[in-house]
């Protein structure tokens, strides 16, 4: 049953908070700045309102998740720290003497209460509203980009991942007590996941019997992290790693297995919209959603800055129709074509035809329309194939036995022509220099907030991680 969380405590020990938690403490500042009651309103349909045992207040459970994300803790370590860290208890609206939840409650909260909830939009909307209310957000410009997060398992199987974490646990233990190696069971040789899990559990049992060793913070953290991974794996039937992670590419020679977060950020470095997808999704298709979500959240957008991925024909049309400026350079293939240097066909303006590298003039031309309406039509120029057969430059140009030889050139759309002219203006060049800000934000997300790697498997878990991370980053 849903119980409303009291907004104040009647404990005789509350004055400890004023003495020990400074005014500039991050958790104190967040608690005083944000009214988290919107979480209860959003999740109340997931609770029975008048029957059953009293549930832990949803606002407090959500705050536990924020703490987990801020401090990169396992569920068990989070609960343990919440017992004695007064800044945690203050943030959670607990009295100093109050007890804390069991770590299993966090798993239930994630799976039972947060399913079917768009936590990302809810939290981003809240932080944007706060920024507007406090006069932090004043610009009408957003910068768009996508940042990648590797899967928790990357390209490893669940067995390989357990082996890796088990090895890290053993290495940590050996630093304090190398002789314990004699007490560990033999490593499994069958190659099965079940045997690897049994072996790792046996190692944990041995360590936990050594009380002085088990209580060391470095060892305890590793044990709790391995236990959480094992629990995740055992809960999944037919577990096979991360089912939603997909391969994406950062360059031709660098791929990753995981997820993408498509981000819109205001000029003041407040994230105004975000969408989490699997790793293979194209950046191009999310510009419209990022703009519309930013506006729904309270932004007045008139300029969008992005890299070449966003200058597609559809995006240019959308920006023109919505009377917004797109600061995104056209891909070089559109502006310059994609022919190799030294193999270019040159246009003869007098003959209104192309001339091949051997100096032969095209004999006719046709307009070729594309089946995909988002692609520009082409002009196809035809050459005298009899000349091609005996041409000294035919290797790599004319295919032996072909009945025709043609050269195609895409006709630039009116959108591309307008953007090509716009990107040469001083205004475009000045605004394009602001794109570095979102690269810096991506770096902050990854290196300061642990967004480089997913901390759970599945798209649902990634969305929760993304929502909590961006909420904290915006604060």
For each predicted feature, which ranges?
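Charged, often Cys/His-bearing segments associated with DNA-binding zinc-finger transcription factors
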Residues: 1-34, 394-417
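Basic, short loop/linker segments at the boundary and entry of helix-turn-helix/winged-helix-like folds
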Residues: 26-66, 70
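Short coil/turn segments at secondary-structure boundaries
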Residues: 49-56, 65-74, 94-97, 111-118
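Contiguous, well-ordered alpha-helical segments that form the cores/surfaces of helical PPI scaffolds
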Residues: 58-69, 84-88, 261-262, 289-292
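Positions in alpha-helical segments
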Residues: 62-65, 104-108
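Anion-binding and metal-coordination hotspots
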Residues: 74-77, 82, 98-99, 107-475
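Short, positively charged loop/turn segments that connect secondary-structure elements
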Residues: 87-105
């Amino acid at each position: 049953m849903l119980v409303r969380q009291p907004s104040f405590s009647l404990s005789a020990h509350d004055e400890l908070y004023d003495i020990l938690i400074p005014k500039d403490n991050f958790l104190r500042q967040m608690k005083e700045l944000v009214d988290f009651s919107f979480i209860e309103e959003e999740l109340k349909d997931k609770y029975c309102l008048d029957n059953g045992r009293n549930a832990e207040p949803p606002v407090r459970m959500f705050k536990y998740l924020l703490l987990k994300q801020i401090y990169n803790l396992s569920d068990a370590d989070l609960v343990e720290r919440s017992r004695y860290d007064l800044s945690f208890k203050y943030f959670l609206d607990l009295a100093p003497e109050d007890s804390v939840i069991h770590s299993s409650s966090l798993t239930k909260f994630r799976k039972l209460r947060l399913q079917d909830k768009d936590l990302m939009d809810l939290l981003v909307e809240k932080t944007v509203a706060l920024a507007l209310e406090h006069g932090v957000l004043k610009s009408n410009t957003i910068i768009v980009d996508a940042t990648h997060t590797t899967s928790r398992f990357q390209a490893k199987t669940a067995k390989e991942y357990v082996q890796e974490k088990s090895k890290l646990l053993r290495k940590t233990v050996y630093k304090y007590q190398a002789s314990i190696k004699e007490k560990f069971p033999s490593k499994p040789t069958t190659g099965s996941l079940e045997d690897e899990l049994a072996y790792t559990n046996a190692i944990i049992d041995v360590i936990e019997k050594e009380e002085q060793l088990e209580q060391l913070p470095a060892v305890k953290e590793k044990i709790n992290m391995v236990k959480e991974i094992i629990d995740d794996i055992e809960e999944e039937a037919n577990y096979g790693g991360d089912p939603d992670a997909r391969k994406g590419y950062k360059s031709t020679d660098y791929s990753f297995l995981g997820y993408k977060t498509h981000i819109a950020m205001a000029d003041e470095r407040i994230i105004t919209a975000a969408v989490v997808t699997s790793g293979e999704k194209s950046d191009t298709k999310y510009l419209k959603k990022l703009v519309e979500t930013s506006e729904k959240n309270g932004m007045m957008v008139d300029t969008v800055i992005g890299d070449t991925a966003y200058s597609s024909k559809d995006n240019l049309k959308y920006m023109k129709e919505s009377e917004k400026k797109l600061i995104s350079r056209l891909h070089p293939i559109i502006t310059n074509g994609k022919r190799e240097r030294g193999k270019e066909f040159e246009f003869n303006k007098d003959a209104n035809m192309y001339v091949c590298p051997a100096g032969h003039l095209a004999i006719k031309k046709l307009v070729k329309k594309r089946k995909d309406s988002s692609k520009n039509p082409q002009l196809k120029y035809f050459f005298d194939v009899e000349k091609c057969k005996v041409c000294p430059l035919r290797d790599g140009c004319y295919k032996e036995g072909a009945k025709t030889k043609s050269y195609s050139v895409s006709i630039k759309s009116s959108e591309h022509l307008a953007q090509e002219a716009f990107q040469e203006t001083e205004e475009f060049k000045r605004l394009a220099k602001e794109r570095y800000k979102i690269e810096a934000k991506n770096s902050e997300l990854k290196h300061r907030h642990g967004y480089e790697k997913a901390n759970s498997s599945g798209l649902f878990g990634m969305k929760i991680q993304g929502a909590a991370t961006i909420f904290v980053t915006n604060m």
